[in-house]
């Protein structure tokens, strides 16, 4: 029913996601920058997995934006420890991606 995400869909998904991320973080503007960085990194990795559909990725990113919104301070501390959004993504979300890609 839903097509897998390919690179041609990436611009559309990024546009939709940035809107979603801004909506969820408008009351925590200090954390918005980090949340957007981390989730755009996640979106890129999800887009490379051809078995994940657009709807699945959208649900995943929605859930992760809510989690990161609530855990912003923890994410900031992890970012200071590891210094890379890619490493943060790999550490925090490997299991979640496995769950959502079933």
Swiss-Prot record:
Keywords: Host membrane, Membrane, Transmembrane, Transmembrane helix. GO terms for cellular component: host cell membrane; membrane. It is found in: Host membrane. The keyword Membrane applies. The chain crosses the membrane at residues 5-27. It is a single-pass membrane protein. Its main location: host cell. This is Uncharacterized protein N1. It comes from Microplitis demolitor bracovirus (isolate Webb) (MdBV). The gene is N1.
């Amino acid at each position: 029913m839903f097509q897998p995400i390919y690179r041609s869909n990436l611009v559309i998904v990024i546009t939709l996601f940035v809107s979603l991320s801004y909506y969820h973080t408008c009351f925590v503007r200090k954390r918005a920058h980090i949340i957007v960085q981390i989730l755009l990194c996640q979106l890129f990795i999800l887009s490379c997995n051809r078995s994940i559909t657009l709807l699945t990725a959208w649900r995943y990113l929605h859930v992760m934006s809510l989690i990161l919104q609530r855990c912003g301070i923890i994410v900031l501390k992890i970012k200071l420890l590891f210094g890379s959004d890619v490493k943060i993504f790999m550490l925090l979300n490997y299991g979640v991606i496995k769950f959502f890609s079933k």
